[in-house]
């Protein structure tokens, strides 16, 4: 299964996967507005490639059911909270 991947110029780390290049007909208008003008990144064969941040099966299922897959960036790490938790565990 081939898919085209686009990145959002408005939301860093947000990517849109669609089955056909430049065919955004299945993407809701509200999502298109929030996403901004898509920037083409690459064409990928999902049968032959692993993806770094998302599960290939979830991408394929979403594209079959909805006609697209939206990848959101991972939540930011709160390094201060992690440091506080480590310190609390070290205190006797």
Swiss-Prot record:
Domain YcgL as annotated: residue spans: 1-84
Region described as Disordered: 69-92
This protein's name: YcgL domain-containing protein VC_1957
UniProt organism field: Vibrio cholerae serotype O1 (strain ATCC 39315 / El Tor Inaba N16961)
Coiled coil (residue ranges): none
Listed Pfam families: YcgL
